[in-house]
């Protein structure tokens, strides 16, 4: 029993130990599992992070679009870092040391300043003489565009006598096969030599001129420039020729002019269409300059105000500018030619100006000239000048297309200064901050004073080929332009032959389709201008026709009116006391000056020709404007005869009298005595006997007719004043007067001439002497004083002075007979067969009576 108890105790102890062991094992397993889980999590996190980094690194590697494994990504990353390290080392070696330049200048600005100071440009040449790069500064020094030199041989720009020497210098390194080591390229390959280079010209026909230059540079292997820093340079080399090209070297040099330049010329434009505005006086002095001008020309506004614009122009451009300014003064606006403007930094820049004249808003007088100046490049100037000369200008794209040719392995068109600097183990790149420095860095064209360094060639050297058809087209275009300007009426059909002729012209060999289309566009523009001018001329013609129609309507209204004249009879002769002018049924008695225009029949048609034109004209007197002229005057009606005077048809007219006839009341100082008859063949008697200060002209004559004309408003266009000196008969220009001939008195010239011939010469001389002794101050003398004298005829006229040169007076007739012949009944019954119709005079133009101002 005791044993049983002890056994039970022992079994319980064993069971307790087994359970504790099992529990311990379970605890240990749980701990290991937890550690394993955490370790797996951390490992997975690390792997995920590593994969993310590898993926990000692979995405940054260039040139491969396919998915790469981790080892490839790591390998390419190592290669990239290695090349980057090499590039950094090269950049550090080529970096300009800080003690060479001021700290405030960048490498680009310092490089441009050095080029300006050296009067040079960069040039990269292959060993066979092919030019692969040239800087833009060559334009201001040698007047060549970079596109003219790239892909060309250097020997084309060197005199023939220097070809062998230059070729020997460039090919020297080829004799040493082991000299192309990096050490040799860095230290022992500097080369310097002098030669002559051809200077460019606008006209290829001009004689060639060479400038003496100095080359200073080094041979550089193209493999020394890393692919990552080529900046597109590698793309210009075709892949099939790249291995052979990479084994070659080039000569990168700074080309300097032997003769320094004092006045620079900036030929390139960094930003197109740079412009500024200014205002000038009519004497072309600066009145205003806007804020955009100082960065371009260097002058502040106060520095140029008051100075003449011609002080800043190149002497060779003054003549063309003067012509442009004359055109501006004639037409009020225009565009100047290309010209050079001197900046404050003593540099020439090319400008073109659009200008117009502004006028005062009140008095319409020109105030000043507004100018908009645009900066242009030398390439544009040269292209325009060559177009004027009829020379084909090669397009810039053609030079760039040459680099696409697969048959040439060394035609490389580099486009920036950075590439040449990289070949020279330099890597500066132009920055936006160096814009002002670039403008001041371009050097000028060689001064003509440096002629000792120039070698002119024989003028028999054949010039560059140009297109004669293009030149002819340009000349034809200019001739069409001159015809369109000078012609007064141009039809639209004029432009059709020109367009068809231009379309039928054969395209010469070498002329591109683009150039031919540009010429057709110019011809189309000329055609549009001609059509526009034609439309303007047609509009002017229509307007003039409308004005002519209105004038004809006024003439018809004037011809529809009548004129009635009342003659007052006196004892010794005829005293015309009043003149009544009627229009329809109304009689206007207001005193109004009458403007008329007419012509004088030549004296040789009536007389022998001994009387000059000046003697035929009646001296005019000034009619003073007084208040009495505004008052109305009644028309005197007495023993008068109403006469209707016939008209004259057109005849030969000479010696026009440019004045206006005004019939007024008699005055003491306005007497003109005109003889009623004059001898035709008498050369001894003087026509004008007296001419006193009271403006009286007295003609010696026997029988005279005293007339008194009173001013009355006339609605017609002309009044014919009696004048026995010229014709011998009163004539008017109204066709309606012919309807009153049944009641009118018509006198013939033949009767007057017969009466003059029948009169003895002695009696005529006595009458002339007696008329010279008579001094009658007015026609208001009593009739009793004239009983003992033969009847005299006086004509008193007053004419208004005014500035219309077209107004003329016809003095064509007089009244030679006495008062007994004037009654209409007596004339109609006894003298019907003696009436004679004289030609009708027609005046050139009529003055509107409404526009006549009282004097």
UniProtKB/Swiss-Prot annotation:
Residues 392-411, 420-497, 613-650, 752-791, 814-855 are annotated as: Disordered. This is Circadian locomoter output cycles protein kaput. Contains a Gln-rich C-terminal domain which could correspond to the transactivation domain. Keywords: Activator, Acyltransferase, Biological rhythms, Cytoplasm, DNA damage, DNA-binding, Glycoprotein, Isopeptide bond, Nucleus, Phosphoprotein, Repeat, Transcription, Transcription regulation, Transferase, Ubl conjugation. Residues 371-854 are annotated as: Interaction with NR3C1. Residues 107-177, 262-332 form the PAS domain. Residues 34-84 form the bHLH domain. The record marks 39, 43, 47 as: Interaction with E-box DNA. Changing residue 67 to R: Decrease in sumoylation and its transcriptional activity. Abolishes sumoylation and interaction with ESR1 and decrease in its transcriptional activity. The modification Phosphothreonine is found at residues 451, 461. Transcriptional activator which forms a core component of the circadian clock. The circadian clock, an internal time-keeping system, regulates various physiological processes through the generation of approximately 24 hour circadian rhythms in gene expression, which are translated into rhythms in metabolism and behavior. It is derived from the Latin roots 'circa' (about) and 'diem' (day) and acts as an important regulator of a wide array of physiological functions including metabolism, sleep, body temperature, blood pressure, endocrine, immune, cardiovascular, and renal function. The keyword Phosphoprotein applies. Changing residue 427 to A: Significant loss of phosphorylation. Residues 478-493, 619-650, 818-837 have a biased composition (Low complexity). GO terms for cellular component: chromatoid body; chromosome; CLOCK-BMAL transcription complex; cytoplasm; cytosol; nucleoplasm; nucleus; transcription regulator complex. Changing residue 42 to D: Significant decrease in transcriptional activation by the CLOCK-BMAL1 heterodimer. Significant decrease in transcriptional activation by the CLOCK-BMAL1 heterodimer, reduced nuclear localization and DNA-binding. Expressed equally in brain, eye, testes, ovaries, liver, heart, lung, kidney. In the brain, expression is abundant in the suprachiasmatic nuclei (SCN), in the pyriform cortex, and in the hippocampus. Low expression throughout the rest of the brain. Expression does not appear to undergo circadian oscillations. PANTHER family: CIRCADIAN LOCOMOTER OUTPUT CYCLES PROTEIN KAPUT. It comes from Mus musculus. The keyword DNA repair does not apply. It is found in: Nucleus; Cytoplasm; Cytoplasm, Cytosol. Ubiquitinated, leading to its proteasomal degradation. The modification Phosphoserine is found at residues 38, 42, 408, 427, 431. Changing residue 74 to E: Reduced BMAL1 binding. Abolishes transcriptional activation by the CLOCK-BMAL1 heterodimer.
């Amino acid at each position: 029993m005791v044993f049983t108890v002890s056994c039970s105790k022992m079994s319980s102890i064993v069971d307790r130990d087994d359970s504790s062991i099992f529990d311990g094992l379970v605890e240990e397993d749980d701990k290991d599992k937890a550690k394993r889980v955490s370790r797996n999590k951390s490992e997975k996190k690390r792997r995920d992070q590593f994969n993310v980094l590898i993926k990000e690194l692979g995405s940054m590697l260039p040139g491969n679009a396919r998915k790469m494994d981790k080892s490839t990504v790591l390998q390419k990353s190592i290669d990239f870092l290695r090349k980057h390290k090499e590039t950094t080392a090269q950049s550090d070696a080529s970096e300009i040391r800080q003690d060479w330049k001021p700290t405030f200048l960048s490498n680009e600005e310092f490089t441009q300043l050095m080029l300006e100071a050296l009067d040079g440009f960069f040039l990269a040449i292959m060993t066979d003489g092919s030019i692969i790069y040239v800087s833009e500064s060559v334009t201001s020094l040698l007047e060549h565009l970079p596109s003219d030199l790239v892909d060309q041989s250097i020997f084309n720009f060197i005199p023939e006598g220097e070809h062998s020497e230059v070729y020997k210098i460039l090919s020297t390194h080829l004799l040493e096969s082991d000299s192309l080591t990096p050490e040799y390229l860095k230290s022992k390959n500097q080369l310097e030599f002098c030669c002559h280079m051809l200077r460019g010209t606008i006209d290829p026909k001009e004689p060639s001129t060479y400038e003496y230059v100095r080359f200073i540079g080094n041979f550089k292997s193209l493999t020394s420039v890393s692919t990552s820093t080529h900046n597109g340079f590698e793309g210009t080399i075709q892949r099939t020729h790249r291995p052979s090209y990479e084994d070659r070297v080039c000569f990168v040099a700074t080309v300097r002019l032997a003769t320094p330049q004092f006045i620079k010329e900036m030929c390139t434009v960094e930003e197109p269409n740079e412009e500024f505005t200014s205002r000038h006086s009519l004497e072309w002095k600066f009145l205003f300059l806007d804020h955009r001008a100082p960065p371009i020309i260097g002058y502040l506004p106060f520095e140029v105000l008051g100075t003449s614009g011609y002080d800043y122009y190149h002497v060779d451009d003054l003549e063309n500018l003067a012509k442009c300014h004359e055109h501006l003064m004639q037409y009020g606006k225009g565009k100047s030619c290309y010209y050079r403007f001197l900046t404050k930094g003593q540099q020439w820049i090319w400008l073109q100006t659009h200008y117009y004249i502004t006028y005062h808003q009140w008095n319409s007088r020109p105030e000043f000239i507004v100018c908009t100046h645009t900066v242009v490049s030398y390439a544009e100037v040269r292209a325009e000048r060559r177009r004027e000369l009829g020379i084909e200008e090669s397009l810039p794209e053609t030079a760039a297309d040459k680099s696409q040719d697969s048959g040439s392995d060394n035609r490389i068109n580099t486009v920036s200064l950075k590439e040449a600097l990289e070949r020279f183990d330099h890597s500066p790149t132009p920055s936006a901050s160096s814009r002002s420095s670039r403008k001041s860095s371009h050097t000028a064209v060689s001064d003509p004073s440096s002629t000792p360094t120039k070698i002119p060639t024989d003028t028999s050297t054949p010039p560059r080929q140009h297109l004669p058809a293009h030149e002819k087209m340009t000349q034809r275009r200019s001739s069409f332009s001159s015809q369109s300007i000078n012609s007064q009426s141009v039809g639209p059909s004029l432009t059709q032959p020109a367009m068809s002729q231009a379309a039928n012209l054969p395209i010469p060999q070498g002329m591109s389709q683009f150039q031919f289309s540009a010429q057709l566009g110019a011809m189309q523009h000329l055609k549009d201008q001609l059509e526009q001018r034609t439309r303007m001329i047609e509009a002017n013609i229509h307007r003039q026709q409308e004005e002519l129609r209105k004038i004809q309507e006024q003439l018809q209204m004037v011809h529809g009116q009548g004129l009635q004249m009342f003659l007052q009879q006196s004892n010794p002769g005829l005293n015309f006391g009043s003149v009544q002018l009627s229009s329809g049924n109304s009689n206007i008695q207001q005193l109004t000056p009458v403007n008329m225009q007419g012509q004088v029949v030549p004296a040789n048609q009536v007389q022998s020709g001994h009387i000059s034109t000046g003697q035929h004209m009646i001296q005019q007197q000034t009619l003073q404007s007084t208040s009495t002229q505004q008052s109305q005057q009644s028309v005197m009606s007495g023993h008068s005869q109403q006469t209707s005077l016939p008209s004259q048809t057109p005849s030969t007219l000479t010696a026009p009298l440019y004045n206006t006839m005004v019939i007024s009341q008699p005055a003491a100082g306005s007497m003109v005595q005109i003889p009623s008859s004059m001898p035709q063949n008498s050369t001894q008697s003087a026509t004008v006997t007296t001419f006193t200060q009271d403006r009286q002209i007295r003609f010696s004559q026997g029988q005279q007719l005293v007339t008194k004309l009173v001013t009355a408003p006339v609605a017609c266009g002309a009044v014919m004043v009696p004048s026995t000196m010229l014709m011998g008969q009163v004539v008017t220009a109204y066709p309606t007067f012919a309807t009153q001939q049944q009641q009118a008195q018509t006198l013939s010239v033949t009767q007057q001439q017969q009466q003059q011939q029948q009169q003895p010469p002695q009696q005529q001389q006595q009458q002339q002497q007696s008329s010279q002794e008579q001094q009658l101050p007015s026609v208001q003398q009593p009739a009793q004083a004239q009983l003992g004298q033969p009847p005299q005829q006086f004509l008193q006229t007053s004419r208004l002075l005014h500035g219309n040169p077209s107004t003329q007076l016809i003095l064509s007739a007089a009244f030679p007979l006495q008062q007994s012949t004037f009654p209409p009944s007596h004339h109609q019954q006894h003298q019907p067969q003696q009436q004679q119709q004289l030609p009708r005079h027609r005046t050139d133009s009529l003055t509107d009576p409404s526009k006549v101002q009282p004097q």
